[in-house]
Amino acid sequence: MTEIHDKKLYRKKRLEWRLALFGLLVGLASGIIAVCYRLFLTKVDSLRTSVLLSATFWQSVGILLALLFFAFCMHRLLLWAPYSGGSGIPQIRAELLGKIDMAVEPTIVSKFIGGILGNAGGLTLGREGPSIQLGGMLAKKASRLLDVSEMEERYLVTAGAAAGLAAAFNAPLSGALFAMEEIHKSLSHLFLIPCLAACLMANYFSFSVLGVQSAFAFGIHATLPVTALGFIVAMGVLSGLVGVVFNRGLLFANRALP
């Protein structure tokens, strides 16, 4: 009986160490692609602004033609990799639920290039969703190369998605919490081990390349008085209501429009 218990304990510890090691590898890969995506978006945004501010009439015509070309390229990319469209978060969730099976290479290439082209065209595209999908897809590719089990692959895809978010915003805890609340929707130490390892590794790489400053850095110049706490609670309630109305409005529009 003791021997059986020892074997189970050994297998459990071995699995935990495997997940931790693979989580570090996935976190490094996700961190690299998320940081590269963030750097490209920053450069493209700066270039677009400088070009628009100094453009002459005929240069503006050239810009319009370039936008049409960007739109055509994005259309072709979506035909090639249809799951690369949209935010990227629902797609990762559907992948983990087994509802879709995204092709790794086309999705990564289309998401990366399409996001840059969309940003160059002035579309309001954030880096959260793309970084999550890019990280998740790289984790899926790594899982296939490492020949892990289906359960381990699901954990690593979740870890890769969380690491992408962590690297995009220099926020490792936010990445882990997001994965737990929005993607995995459960709490397990087997899930937390690779997720935290991946987030920490991705964030370390992001710090090494981009510095330790947070994505949303602002100074605190005054202490909030206690009397204002009631307004903060009211603002939180109001913001929640607005979010619910907005989400239901989007769902209604998707059902109503052809």
Residue spans of the language-model regions?
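Alpha-helical transmembrane segments and immediately membrane-proximal extracytoplasmic
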Residues: 1-258
